[in-house]
Amino acid sequence: MLYASQRGRLTENLRNALQQDSTTQGCLGAETPSIMYTGAKPDRWAHPLVGTIHASNLYCPMLRAYCRHYGPRPVFVASDESLPMFGASPALHTPVQVQMCLLPELRDTLQRLLPPPNLEDSEALTEFKTSVSSARAILEDPNFLEMREFVTSLASFLSGQYKHKPARLEAFQKQVVLHSFYFLISIKSLEITDTMFDIFQSAFGLEEMTLEKLHIFKQKASVFLIPRRHGKTWIVVAIISLILSNLSNVQIGYVAHQKHVASAVFTEIIDTLTKSFDSKRVEVNKETSTITFRHSGKISSTVMCATCFNKNSIRGQTFHLLFVDEANFIKKEALPAILGFMLQKDAKIIFISSVNSADQATSFLYKLKDAQERLLNVVSYVCQEHRQDFDMQDSMVSCPCFRLHIPSYITMDSNIRATTNLFLDGAFSTELMGDTSSLSQGSLSRTVRDDAINQLELCRVDTLNPRVAGRLASSLYVYVDPAYTNNTSASGTGIAAVTHDRADPNRVIVLGLEHFFLKDLTGDAALQIATCVVALVSSIVTLHPHLEEVKVAVEGNSSQDSAVAIASIIGESCPLPCAFVHTKDKTSSLQWPMYLLTNEKSKAFERLIYAVNTASLSASQVTVSNTIQLSFDPVLYLISQIRAIKPIPLRDGTYTYTGKQRNLSDDVLVALVMAHFLATTQKHTFKKVH
């Protein structure tokens, strides 16, 4: 039995012995290169293990792989057999009884192709010796030695030397380790970050990962959505304990959603440090919930454990790593204090949480799926393609295209699924499996019900039937939301034409929809848009001869002059008498045929949402569209935008609405919203232009 206080001295003795006996460390001690390329200086590259070679070899994966397998490896205190516990590739060992040799023909050919190095080029020789010195200096760098100690301690931790029980990291746990470890490298070793990234690749089994992808670990924030009981808090405790004990001058923060969780983590970190390391170096301050680990001759490392209920406890602190446990349940009042660390140059926030589908407010992290940087990491047992199959088969517990890997401490089968869903429908998918597809489809607080959308799609009105046409009003309401661009990836001109029931103005029928883009940016944009409106009205009037007048609103928020021009052209060319919504000029008594959209938009959206959910909005069986693709049903085109409606809360407690998607604008939806608003409110005054 050995005291923990003696561990450091024994570790140093073992490391020295390994370095003396190592057969690979001598490679960096070579004074003469194996290859000496004597070309121009810009064309050569000094490699510390090979010599001076052509610079094109910098991009040679074979050389990189050869040096990684046969070159010197960082000497870890634990044996290399323990490294595969968290994904490392084992070192290549050649059996003693096997004598490796080259075939004579191959040897002679290589000797002709590779003449003895020419050591007369003193400049190239100096470059080689400089590269060797630089490589040695990195292996002796204090930060490198600390990082090596962290990897060594992690291997020992997983092999059971601390907890007396071997463990193996899950994929997401390894990711949390990598995000923490590589970020600390990037802030503690700025000048040699890429070199150290490369050195530690083999320890984590990342040989095939490019340096560009490794830079993902330098992100200022990372988010992990993990199912319940998968070891989220366990790995955070291990990471914090090992960082404190092996790395100097590191400040860590831990924020939990409940006080008892923070207290449990605080106690577990103390227990790990005092039992596995020198307890005399551990200082605990229970009043401030801080733990300090003193490093001889270096700056101490600390961790503070706080809760979101004391939102000011972390203000004024400096953290290099801030772990936010169960982040989906953190009080929103505490988020500004947490997100403030994003401004700190050498700080990283790691959000770790389970998935919760009970409330939109506690599932906000999934919104980061659209972030420009790949911040979101989700563990799920079902993919998007098989989501519907999963719902239809009660016996399925995972996606058929996945190779199911369930941690040993998790029970997941059809009986568990059935029992869990009896308590709360859908709980198995979200809480236990990490399924976030329901979040992406807006099922948390669905704005428009699925059955209402299905009715809008399937139950269309036969407006060509004389009996139905006799019940419809004689007025056609048209709303024009013009856009003066020919970029089909941006917003286009949205046009919607509706009418209503003669007896019930709240019952609205959609007769026409247009999504129009300018062919080119010329001076006749107003003419093109107006022509599109006139063509739509002409088609509708041809099918519905009972219509007697057209009431139009041309939005003028983008360009008032163009809106007036559009209204004038429509008034002159329309086959029916036209009346327009007018806006009074503030500086004079003049009224212009345009509509300025203000705060009525939110009310109009709410009115349309109510209409869809109550089936008071319908579409005609002959809904007209001259611009939406012939292969695409205009009503389905509209429904795709209705499904995307989402409310956005404002500071004053009200909401604004949008239907914009990544690959589709909401121009047609906005036009329909406002056309429906004009037809149902009956409060706007329409006047003729001439």
Swiss-Prot record:
A UniProt-annotated Pfam family: DNA_pack_C
Cross-referenced InterPro entries: DNA_pack_C, DNA_pack_C_sf, DNA_pack_N, HSV_TRM3, P-loop_NTPase
Keyword DNA-binding: yes
Main location: host cell
Single annotated GO MF: DNA binding
Keywords for this protein: DNA-binding, Host nucleus, Hydrolase, Viral genome packaging, Viral release from host cell
Residue positions of the active site: E326, D481, E555, D667
EC number: 3.1.-.-
Gene Ontology terms: biological process: chromosome organization
Top-level EC class: hydrolase
Motif Walker B motif boundaries: 321-326
GO cellular component: host cell nucleus
Domain of life: Viruses
Places the protein is found: Host nucleus
Residue positions of motif Walker A motif: 226-233
Function: Component of the molecular motor that translocates viral genomic DNA in empty capsid during DNA packaging. Forms a tripartite terminase complex together with TRM1 and TRM2 in the host cytoplasm. Once the complex reaches the host nucleus, it interacts with the capsid portal vertex. This portal forms a ring in which genomic DNA is translocated into the capsid. TRM3 carries an RNase H-like nuclease activity that plays an important role for the cleavage of concatemeric viral DNA into unit length genomes.
Subunit composition and interactions: Interacts with the terminase subunits TRM1 and TRM2. Interacts with portal protein.
Family as reported in the entry's similarity comment: Belongs to the herpesviridae TRM3 protein family.
Stated name of the protein: Tripartite terminase subunit 3
Lineage: Viruses, Duplodnaviria, Heunggongvirae, Peploviricota, Herviviricetes
